[in-house]
Structure formats: C-alpha cells, structure tokens
Amino acid sequence: MPSASDQFPQRIALVHEWFSPRSVGGAERVVEAIDSLLQSRGCEPQLAALIDAESCRSGSWLQGRSVLTSPIQGLPWGRSHVQQYLPLLPFAVEQIDLGAAELVISSSHLVAKGVLTGPEQLHISYVHTPVRYAWDQMHAY
C-alpha cells in the first residue's frame, strides 16, 4: 500500500495576485509559508502571479525564482501599479497556463482564485478577506 508521501503531488503551482515589494502583508506571508511547507516536502512549486517585481529583488524570498506572469506584466506601469488594471485582472489571471500542474494552490484576496484549471487538476484556494483598499478608495477604482 502506498504511503501518503508517495501520493503527494510533485507538480504543484502556487498562485497569488502579485509579488511586489510595494505590497507585503499577511497574504504574502501566507504564500511564503505555503511555499516553505511545500519545499520542506521536497517540492519546489511553480509560482504564478499577475505580475512579479520580487524575484529580481536582492534579499527577497523569491530572489532567483521563476514566476509565471500574466500579460499585465508587460503593460505600462503593470509591475508598479497593477491595481490600475483592476477591470482586466479577472481576464488576466485566466491567461496564466498551469496545465502541467497536478495541484494548484491559490492564495487569493482578489482574483487569483479565478485561475483556470482542468478537470484532472485539484485546485485548493486559501481565500483572504476581500480587497479592502478597493472599498476604502472606491472612487479611485
């Protein structure tokens, strides 16, 4: 009989809204903790986000990691002001291809939970409180 560790998926994707030095809070700490847990089990998850401005930053926990990103990454101010593209974010997260993953884990306060998965993929979503800044600054959005 196979043990539980034999059945643990090796192709795992870890999805978050964005990796940015301008946005580090509880949700980002949750992603870091999930990543650390998976790595302790011998699995380095494929990271994915709408934008990534962290993996190239010296001292970041993501330094040197490969992060799949959405088309927002290449738009003007996409990396520095991703929230300005709020109406496009649900569509953008659907453009991230995670077809190779057996397990998709999303950490979401906005749209990461909307990443597309296939019928053979298990998707577990850690859903944080709703996007408070959009309510607090509703006229800006």
PLM feature spans:
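Active-site donor-binding segments of glycosyltransferases and PAPS-dependent sulfotransferases
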Residues: 40-111
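Structural motif
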Residues: 11, 102-103, 122
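Acceptor-binding helix/loop patch of EC 2.4 sugar-transfer enzymes
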Residues: 72-79, 118-141
